[in-house]
Amino acid sequence: MNTQDFLLELGCEELPPKNLQHLSNALTYNLTTEFDKLKLSYSSVESFATPRRLAVLVNGLQLQQNNQTIERKGPLISELDKAIEGFAKSCGVARNMLTQKAFGKIQYYFFTKQQIGLKTIDLLESVVNTAIQNIPIAKPMRWSNLDTYFVRPVHWLIMMLGSDVVPASIMGLISSNITRGLRFTDECIFDIICAKDYQKTLLEKAQIEVDFDMRKAIIRKQIIHVAQNNNATAVIDESLLDEVCALVEYPCVFSGNFSSKFLDIPEEVLISVMKSYQKYFHMLDMNGNLMSSFISVANIESSDLSVIIDGNERVIRSRLSDSEFFWIQDKAYTLEFRLDRLNQVLFMKSLGSMGDKAKRIEILSGYIAGVIGANVKDSSRAGLLCKSDLVTDMVGEFADLQGVMGGYYAFNDGENKAVSVAISEHYQPRFSGDSLPNTIEGLVVSIADKLDTITGIFGIGQGPTGSKDPYALRRMALGLLRIILESKFHINLKELISESLNAHLSVVNTNKANDIYQFMMERLRSYYKKHEVSMQVFDAVLAVCPESPYDFHLRIRALNTFTNNQELENLIEINKRISNILKNCSDLSIKVDDSVLIETAEKTLFKATKILAKRISNSINYTKNMKELIALKDMIDEFFDKVMVNTDDVELRQARLNLINWVRSLFLSVADISYLV
């Protein structure tokens, strides 16, 4: 089979850096999908992406489709002539060109023909055009007078098969083997001689590393080297590194400085300025303290690097001066003073202002603190003030610092440490895998804030539907549940939801409590799925309706102890025997009239379970409880072997059925074992 390497390059205006990898992956996927549809084989695929180009190299692409035998099944041979003639006509042949063939035990007419495989070079224009059109682009652009759309205007197109140019016209461009170098070096134009040498040619002639991962590794290495030269450690944020890599074709890393006076500003502000606005990497000294220095990546190697450094230092100096001004101005007014301004900030239509939300968080934080034993006064105070930083100049400029700046301002106002820290960390966890607040007051306010949003939005009928979750309530609920589980808080979730709904007064529909609870349970299901807990185990616990998520967790953990061992088999066997006896019974009770029991086995079982019930009634050591319940197996077996449950004595029969039901209730105090079968 003859093969050649196929190269596609789209030369664009600067592509959006945060979408570069997505665009590259989509183009590669679409291209290989089209080849697979056409049954064109290839040995491997390489993707390349820089700010100005998307490229794909398909190694060992089959040069022609394989010949195929096309067989089409027609009518029965016993069909009317009209049907047979019609089938032949639809195939474009005379009737005598049809063949007869058994399909199962019945004879049919078939049309068979040999289809010669098409040459790959004749298919590539359509393949590439389809691959480009199928790239998902949120905001496509149109340019020139062409009826063509793409994420950015495309200025050149390379399509090569081996060393030959593939003739094609796509997006108004004629394919060639000509590419371009760096924009800032007179944009040299040169040829790609052979598809397989694409990466090597760009590196040698234009110093452009088109492989995203290799370019990223080069940048990382240079950053580490520059930091070492500054006797520092660079903090390399992976998402920032990806973004910077998507901004440069020829990376040149350098460091710069700013005045140490700016270190008086909270370091989160400095880092945000460097990272979010300037795309800089910050450095720490040997003691782990933030330095008044930064690392940046230029898109060219300058003959006079000092010019680039001076320019960057001038820009960040201006940025930090603004931040210093915000910091000084914001400290002039306390968070409490700003509460009035919160009343002018809308939280959500029908749910009032941010001031209303702050008051609800204050009430709910006090309630939660009382339940779990946290400081009610500090929790309530932090809840009231936690949103006041939203009306500060600093948070107006750096929205990602909300909460963090509130903590600094609270401390500046003279609020105690517990209140200040709780305010600073109450947004945590912000995303999956994020750390939880470190203080109990922070945990309390975080729960209150998240639950207030969830109950409010559900209460006005705008909860998540299907795949749509515009207010990120699923993520919020998962964060809330993580706090309760990982902090081991014994909180009744139904009561907590009711308290939150009541805090909204008449604004929301309080009948939504059950919907919210079910929503939270589904998020809990997702949490355990992620942690590879069997859904049978989850459903077994869910069936007994524990209302505390942490209590739910303890039951899950207990059942997991017994999976895949003999004790689980014993559990299932006990449950099966009990269920078989009780499945058609009604009017059951767990109150046993032991005065009518006559057999030793039933008396022994009742006495043992009565003693055990007292031991486990208030115990949340469910693993121990289950072990003690499993230990009843021999007594239960003896009861079933020696006692006739369905006796003619109605009173005795009822007592025995109630005894069995009583035993079942003890097992249900942990979970419904029937779900494990």
From Swiss-Prot:
Primary location class: cytoplasm
Keywords: Aminoacyl-tRNA synthetase, ATP-binding, Cytoplasm, Ligase, Nucleotide-binding, Protein biosynthesis
Domain of life: Bacteria
Reactions listed under catalytic activity: tRNA(Gly) + glycine + ATP = glycyl-tRNA(Gly) + AMP + diphosphate
Cellular component terms (Gene Ontology): cytosol
Any one GO molecular-function label of the UniProt entry: glycine-tRNA ligase activity
Pfam families linked to this entry: DALR_1, tRNA_synt_2f
Protein name: Glycine--tRNA ligase beta subunit
BP GO terms, sorted: arginyl-tRNA aminoacylation; glycyl-tRNA aminoacylation
Gene name per UniProt: glyS
Compartments (UniProt record): Cytoplasm
EC number: 6.1.1.14
Organism: Vesicomyosocius okutanii subsp. Calyptogena okutanii (strain HA)
Family affiliation: Belongs to the class-II aminoacyl-tRNA synthetase family.
NCBIfam families registered for this protein in UniProt: glyS (TIGR00211)
SUPFAM superfamilies registered for this protein in UniProt: HD-domain/PDEase-like
Assembly, per entry: Tetramer of two alpha and two beta subunits.
